């Protein structure tokens, strides 16, 4: 039997997709042998799929102010932010509110 996978969906909108190769939706199969929190996911994203200007998406170990994060349509602030443990089929949406003038 193969390695267990944790399947989740990442979505990017309102300009956040521009930092990720202009891809608005990604289905991921993460290593199911480890515990995946949003903090771990952000590190993975930075290392693997963040293609443009990471300073516009990340600030330290978290998303920068102006990036909204919704997990299954719920504000991540209500779910524990970086400590939230990802579950199978979670949908994580990143929305940029940062727009030039």
Curated annotation (Swiss-Prot):
Query: What pathway, per the record?
Result: tRNA modification; 5-methoxycarbonylmethyl-2-thiouridine-tRNA biosynthesis
Any one GO biological process: protein urmylation
**Record-linked Pfam families:** Urm1 (PF09138)
- InterPro entries, A to Z: Beta-grasp_dom_sf (IPR012675), Mopterin_synth/thiamin_S_b (IPR016155), Urm1 (IPR015221)
1-thioglycine modification, residue list: 101
Keyword Transmembrane helix assigned:
no
- Which interval of the chain is the signal sequence? none
Specify the superkingdom.
Answer: Eukaryota
- A single GO CC term, please? cytosol
Glycyl lysine isopeptide (Gly-Lys) (interchain with K-? in acceptor proteins) crosslink residues: 101
Where is this gene product found?
A: Cytoplasm
Q: For this UniProt record, give its keywords in alphabetical order, as a comma-separated list.
A: Cytoplasm, Isopeptide bond, tRNA processing, Ubl conjugation pathway
Q: How is it modified after translation?
A: C-terminal thiocarboxylation occurs in 2 steps, it is first acyl-adenylated (-COAMP) via the hesA/moeB/thiF part of the MOCS3 homolog, then thiocarboxylated (-COSH) via the rhodanese domain of the MOCS3 homolog.
What broad class describes the main subcellular location of this protein? Answer: cytoplasm
Q: Give the protein's function.
A: Acts as a sulfur carrier required for 2-thiolation of mcm(5)S(2)U at tRNA wobble positions of cytosolic tRNA(Lys), tRNA(Glu) and tRNA(Gln). Serves as sulfur donor in tRNA 2-thiolation reaction by being thiocarboxylated (-COSH) at its C-terminus by MOCS3. The sulfur is then transferred to tRNA to form 2-thiolation of mcm(5)S(2)U. Also acts as a ubiquitin-like protein (UBL) that is covalently conjugated via an isopeptide bond to lysine residues of target proteins such as Prx2/Jafrac1, Ciao1, Eip71CD and GILT1.
Question: Subunit arrangement?
Answer: Interacts with cer.
Can you tell me which family this protein belongs to? Belongs to the URM1 family.
Its name, as the record gives it, is: Ubiquitin-related modifier 1 homolog
What is the name of the gene encoding this protein?
Answer: Urm1
């Amino acid at each position: 039997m193969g390695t267990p996978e944790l399947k989740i969906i990442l979505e990017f909108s309102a300009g956040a997709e521009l930092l990720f190769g202009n891809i608005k939706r990604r289905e991921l199969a993460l290593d199911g042998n480890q515990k995946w929190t949003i903090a771990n996911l952000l590190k993975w994203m930075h290392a693997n799929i963040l293609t443009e200007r990471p300073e516009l998406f990340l600030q330290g170990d978290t998303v920068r102010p102006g990036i909204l994060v919704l997990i299954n349509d719920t504000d991540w602030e209500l779910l524990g932010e970086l400590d939230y443990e990802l579950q199978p089929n979670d949908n994580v949406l990143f929305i940029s509110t940062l727009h030039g003038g």
